[in-house]
Amino acid sequence: MNLKIRLAAMNFLEFAAWGAYLTSMGTYLMNIGLGSEIGWFYAVQGIVSIFMPALMGIIADRWIQAQRLLGFCHLFSGLFMFVAAYYALTQQAHIQFGILFTLYTISVAFYMPTLALSNSVAYNALTKAGMDTVKDFPPIRVFGTIGFICMMWIVDIMGFQPNQNQFIVSGICSIILFFYTFTLPKCDTHDDGEKKSVMDIFGLRAFALFRKKKMAIFFIFSMLLGVSLQITNGFANPFITSFKDIPEYANTFGVNHANILISLSQISETCCILLIPFFMKRYGIKNVMLIAMLAWVFRFGLFGFGNPGTGVWMFVLSMIVYGVAFDFFNISGFAVCRSDYKSGTSFKCTRSVYVDDQWYRGYSGDVICSGHCECPYSNDKWDGCY
C-alpha cells in the first residue's frame, strides 16, 4: 500500500479516537448530573500534557520504537475508555465523579502523548522514503481532521451524545489503531548516552526566551486564546443542546444534532489552512495574529447572541469564523518562534508554548467556565460565559 495512504489512515484513526468524545462529553456529563465537573474532565488533558508526552518521548528515543509505543499507548487508552464506559453503563444514576474521573484520566494520560508520537512516526517514515516532510505531511495530517469530523457525525447520528457510548466508539478507534501500528514502518531508537536534566527533558529552559517583551506578549495571548479554545471544546455542545428545554427550539436541527453543527468548525479549520500563505504574505505575521484575535471575539459574540431557530445563522457563522480564529493564530504563532530564533531554540520555544497552552487553557478555561455555568439548564448564565 502507498506510504502516504498508510500514514493518512494512521492520522484518521488517531484523531477519530479523540473526536468521538471531545465535543460531546460535556453534554453527557450534564446528562448524568456532573455538569459542575465538566471543567475537570477537560482540564486533566492539559495537566497530563505537562509530563506524559515528555516521558513517552524519552522512552521512544531510548528503548521502544515510536510506532510500537504509539500502539501500546492507544491500547491502554482504549482499554480504560472501555472500562469507563462499562462503569458508567452499570452504575447509571449512581455514577461517582471520583471513579469515572480516575478511569478517564488514565485513558487521557496514555492518549495525549500519541499526538506527538504519531507525528514522529509520520516524519520518520517520510524521511526514510526520501520525501519532503514540509510538502507531503500537511495533506496527510488533514486526514486526522477528517477522522475527527467523521466520529463527531457518527456519535451524533447514532444518538451517543448524551450517553457513555461515545467512550466505546473512542475505545474501538484506539484498539484498531493499536493493531494497525504493527503494519507501520519501524522507527529506530537513538540513545546518545547524554545525560539530560529535568529542565532539558521538559523543555523548561526555553522559557528564558520569554524575557523578551515580544515573546512574553505572544506567550500571554497564546494562553488567553487557548482558554477560549478549551471553552469551545467543553461547553459548545451543552450550550446548544440546552435549548431543548425551550419549546420553540426543542425540535430544531441544531438542538438534536449539535455535534454536526459544531463540526462546521473543524471543516472551516481545514479550509482556512489554505488561506494562510496568502494572508501571511499579504498582511504579515502581526496582522494575521490580530485577525485571529478579532475572530475569537466574533466567535463567542455570535455564539452568545445566536439560537437554533431564527438565529441559527449566527451559530453557522460562528463555526466558520472558528477556522480563522484557530488556524491564523496557531500557525502565525509558530512562525513568530521560527523567525526570531535558531532552529533548535525555535523547536523548544514552540514546544514550551504548546505545553503551557495545553495545561493552562485546560485548567483555566474549563474550570473557570464550569464554575460560572454549573447548571445552565436552570439558569441564564450562558451569556456571561460567552
Predicted regions and their residues:
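C-terminal transmembrane helical hairpin of 12-TM major facilitator-type secondary transporters
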Residues: 287-333
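A membrane-interface helix-boundary motif in multi-pass transporters
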Residues: 157-173, 371-386
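Cytoplasmic helix-loop-helix junction between adjacent transmembrane helices
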Residues: 105-143
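Helix-loop boundary and gating motifs at the non-cytosolic
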Residues: 1-50, 214-250, 257-258, 330
